[in-house]
Amino acid sequence: MSNEQPKIPQATAKRLPLYYRFLKNLHASGKQRVSSAELSEAVKVDPATIRRDFSYFGALGKKGYGYNVNYLLSFFRRTLEEDEVTEVALFGVGNLGTAFLNYNFSKNNNTKIVMAFDVDERKVGTTVGGVPVYHLDELEERLHENIPVAILTVPAAAAQALTDRLVVQGIKGILNFTPARLNVPNHIRVHHIDLAIELQSLVYFLKNYPSPS
């Protein structure tokens, strides 16, 4: 996000893309304005939290009127720097990695996987979803400073050694889909997404906190 934007809580920052996606859908449907209650129902965030999130950016709406969809959409596009494409490198072209390459964030205008790496000779030299696949040995040669983000879908045992190489190459952010908990310098941001843990958590809540009928 732009350095000119006010410092906001990380929890709020994580919700901004969610708001933006919903606003794009509203705009596409021709809706001109939306209330915090309508936003709340759509994104499953309570209205008070939405109003507080929006308050960090000043007066985005009017009491009794709600929010102008076109204005909010334009505002969040600038805030999220939607007009600037962030290039991403993917590591590990297995089932999950292949799915990412075929999808390649088609709903996001500002994120694009531009290269992938693997050690499987059958995959090296091919393209998946239009993205070239290189051998992991070529990492230092291929990865450049214009690619600040890496997605890891490699075996857990290989994750830390790969991360160490990425740090040396100047990667600034890592989306980690491996079970490994990565050690990185303080200036590197890592988001861990462990699908097995998320599934276990969901099953636990279903069993122990059933929704009211």
Swiss-Prot record:
Keywords: Cytoplasm, DNA-binding, NAD, Repressor, Transcription, Transcription regulation. GO terms for biological process: negative regulation of DNA-templated transcription; response to redox state. It holds the Pfam family CoA_binding. SUPFAM superfamilies: NAD(P)-binding Rossmann-fold domains (SSF51735), Winged helix' DNA-binding domain (SSF46785). Gene3D superfamilies: NAD(P)-binding Rossmann-like Domain (3.40.50.720), Winged helix-like DNA-binding domain superfamily/Winged helix DNA-binding domain (1.10.10.10). NAD(+) binds at residues 92-97. It is found in: Cytoplasm. GO terms for cellular component: cytoplasm. One of its GO terms (molecular function) is DNA-binding transcription factor activity. Transmembrane segments: none annotated. Residues 18-57 bind DNA. HAMAP family: Rex. Homodimer. Modulates transcription in response to changes in cellular NADH/NAD(+) redox state. Belongs to the transcriptional regulatory Rex family. This is Redox-sensing transcriptional repressor Rex.
